[in-house]
Amino acid sequence: MDHLPMPKFGPLAGLRVVFSGIEIAGPFAGQMFAEWGAEVIWIENVAWADTIRVQPNYPQLSRRNLHALSLNIFKDEGREAFLKLMETTDIFIEASKGPAFARRGITDEVLWQHNPKLVIAHLSGFGQYGTEEYTNLPAYNTIAQAFSGYLIQNGDVDQPMPAFPYTADYFSGLTATTAALAALHKVRETSKGESIDIAMYEVMLRMGQYFMMDYFNGGEMCPRMTKGKDPYYAGCGLYKCADGYIVMELVGITQIAECFKDIGLAHLLGTPEIPEGTQLIHRIECSYGPLVEEKLDAWLAAHTIAEVKERFAELNIACAKVLTVPELESNPQYVARESITQWQTMDGRTCKGPNVMPKFKNNPGQIWRGMPSHGMDTAAILKNIGYSENDIQELVSKGLAKVED
């Protein structure tokens, strides 16, 4: 297979990934492959571009490094072109409502007839099967969080609240990426393709597991946090200093002992409620939990963030300032690791945003291209799989493909 023009880089160089999906979850899966060196083809509807394009800046990050194909993959010759593309594809990711592709005739079995080694990742809100009530429903970030038990655990004691920005989309997209790579590893051993059913609510169920395990195995419901503080443990969570906010984790025998000296509670060490060797202070079960919070709040409020960070570094207590977005660029750790970078958009503008992550030492990822325009690479992709200029023009004339204007 001849690859589309692009630099060779990263741990996934030579891999062809195709995805069909809009907005965040499915495309995020594909875009991670693209930043790690895979050749990634983004399929868009012919008549309507991906709705993410209406956003002024985010698409320049979420669709960088991609090849844009505008094709009606469900109809006539457009379907034929799509299936021909699948013959040279390693991984196909689709994000839709339940078994939407199967309902329209593109089943796993049809895809495997064209490529027996194909890895297929289906990403949906409620999965490819289950009850009719749920399987075909649309789902976004908040839907998956609400249905999974994740949302009810977040927010304040007075009201649950979703975790933003779009947590379920990113967790689900990354799950699709890792699952597809796991499947590909097995396919290369067996030469037999794989189909993966990723339900967003199940991803969030797994991500929300920590406190739920106490309910499943004992009926204990975890309370939601109060003003950003850990629902169970004193000295853990969000706290206000004289000039802003920090997060901290008061964990460890020595850390608790030294911190208690600073906040005037050293006399509690070694009591039945806080015996020697205590590593965490339970804010509910320990009768002194509220007092610890009260004293810690007062001590922190009387000190600046810089003073707190300096003292906690001496005590080996984990803490960090809650950075504002404008503070990120100048933070020395961000600068040292080039966590924020710049790249050129297709129309020549400079775009700034997060760099490729994680950092591979021997085969690093890179940004080689901005977001392509709608249908920008349609002709090149179709030529790559054997279509002539006349074939492409015929698809365009029938409304089955769109090429760049």
UniProtKB/Swiss-Prot annotation:
GO molecular function ontology, one term from the record: L-carnitine CoA-transferase activity
Main location: cytoplasm
Catalytic activity: crotonobetainyl-CoA + (R)-carnitine = crotonobetaine + (R)-carnitinyl-CoA; 4-(trimethylamino)butanoyl-CoA + (R)-carnitine = (R)-carnitinyl-CoA + 4-(trimethylamino)butanoate
EC number: 2.8.3.21
Name of one Pfam family that matches: CoA_transf_3
Presence of the UniProt keyword Iron in the record: no
InterPro entries xrefs: CoA-transferase_III, CoA-Trfase_CaiB, CoA-Trfase_fam_III, CoA-Trfase_III_dom3_sf, CoA-Trfase_III_dom_1_sf
SUPFAM superfamilies: CoA-transferase family III (CaiB/BaiF)
UniProt name for this protein: L-carnitine CoA-transferase
Compartmental location: Cytoplasm
HAMAP family: CaiB
Any Gene Ontology CC annotation: cytoplasm
Subunit details: Homodimer.
NCBIfam families, sorted: PRK03525.1
Higher taxonomy: Bacteria, Pseudomonadati, Pseudomonadota, Gammaproteobacteria, Enterobacterales
Family under the similarity heading: Belongs to the CoA-transferase III family. CaiB subfamily.
Binding of CoA, residues: 97, 104
Protein's UniProt keywords contain Cell membrane: no
Residues forming the catalytic site: 169
Organism: Escherichia fergusonii (strain ATCC 35469 / DSM 13698 / CCUG 18766 / IAM 14443 / JCM 21226 / LMG 7866 / NBRC 102419 / NCTC 12128 / CDC 0568-73)
UniProt entry keywords in alphabetical sequence: Cytoplasm, Transferase
GO BP: carnitine metabolic process
Pathway(s) per entry: Amine and polyamine metabolism; carnitine metabolism
Role summary: Catalyzes the reversible transfer of the CoA moiety from gamma-butyrobetainyl-CoA to L-carnitine to generate L-carnitinyl-CoA and gamma-butyrobetaine. Is also able to catalyze the reversible transfer of the CoA moiety from gamma-butyrobetainyl-CoA or L-carnitinyl-CoA to crotonobetaine to generate crotonobetainyl-CoA.
